[in-house]
Amino acid sequence: MASGGQFPPQKQESQPGKEHLMDPSPQHASPHYKPANKLQGKVALVTGGDSGIGRSVCYHFALEGATVAFTFVKGHEDKDANETLELLRKAKSSDAKDPIAIAADLGFDDNCKKVVDQVVNAFGSIDVLVNNAAEQYKASTVEDIDEERLERVFRTNIFAYFFMARHALKHMREGSTIINTTSINAYKGNAKLLDYTATKGAIVAFTRGLSLQLISKGIRVNGVAPGPVWTPLIPSSFDEEEVKQFGSEVPMKRAGQPYEIATAYVFLASCDSSYYSGQVLHPNGGAIVNG
């Protein structure tokens, strides 16, 4: 497992990055993980499930018995999406339906509705919604962030969470769960990722507020705030020297691997977390944060 200073210098030119081009490849599976049918019979929809944390979440959900659907960016993430589909087909339980991948730009309400409709048409319901897709871009100053980019980042990173939730909830029953991916940056700030950080703070507030709205319906809403994790967003966001040192800033002095984060989603999606709602888990390499 790479530690700080052990990633080869590398750079990808477009967001959200491609996992199959990364060196080393992110680790989506732990050799020590033991499935226990925690999600048997459930339908899970994961946005941005083609790579990184999303891929690992999909994989672990499939191991736990869930039928899985995920979204990806068409024309950019097709290869990663196909690799994830093959991975899920091999991991799924015999009584789970075949996984599906849905190409979508989630920054627009109509597209989110189409995604939800496609999942419901295929599988009948949604038991677990994971809002995970995101974009991030470096900027040295607030003046460098123009209106077009600001709107794009907010559409993908927080508008889509609202859109997906409002449409998925029509098909979610008591006992269902929503899990939102936020970030350590929401708690510590990040001068280089100002607009991204603002959206991640909004996701924390959205998670808390929505949990209060839905608690009477028996639907739980929680979040996960990863620290530095080796995903395609990293070589597509930072320069080669920053990539080389990625993860060295946290107490464990290394970046996390996707599988080290995905188990938090399994916990929050399953009945093991039945007394959790409005909470955020912090798999971040030992960084101390408030919240």
From Swiss-Prot:
Query: CDD domains recorded for this chain?
Result: SDR_c1
Q: GO: which molecular function terms?
A: oxidoreductase activity, acting on CH-OH group of donors
State the EC number(s): 1.1.1.-
Alphabetically list the UniProt keywords: Oxidoreductase
**Keyword Protein transport, does the record have it?**
no
Q: Found in which tissues?
A: Expressed in embryogenic cells, somatic embryos and seeds in the later stages of development, but not in non-embryogenic cells and mature leaves.
Residues reported to bind NAD(+): 45-69
Which positions are catalytic residues?
Answer: Y196 (proton acceptor)
Spans annotated as Disordered = 1-35
Binding sites annotated in the UniProt record for substrate: S183
Which top EC class is named for this enzyme in its record? oxidoreductase
InterPro entries per record: NAD(P)-bd_dom_sf, Sc_DH/Rdtase_CS, SDR_fam
Pfam families in the cross-refs: adh_short_C2
Family note: Belongs to the short-chain dehydrogenases/reductases (SDR) family.
Q: What does this protein do?
A: May act as a short alcohol-polyol-sugar dehydrogenase possibly related to carbohydrate metabolism and the acquisition of desiccation tolerance. May also be involved in signal transduction.
In Swiss-Prot or TrEMBL terms, this protein is called Glucose and ribitol dehydrogenase
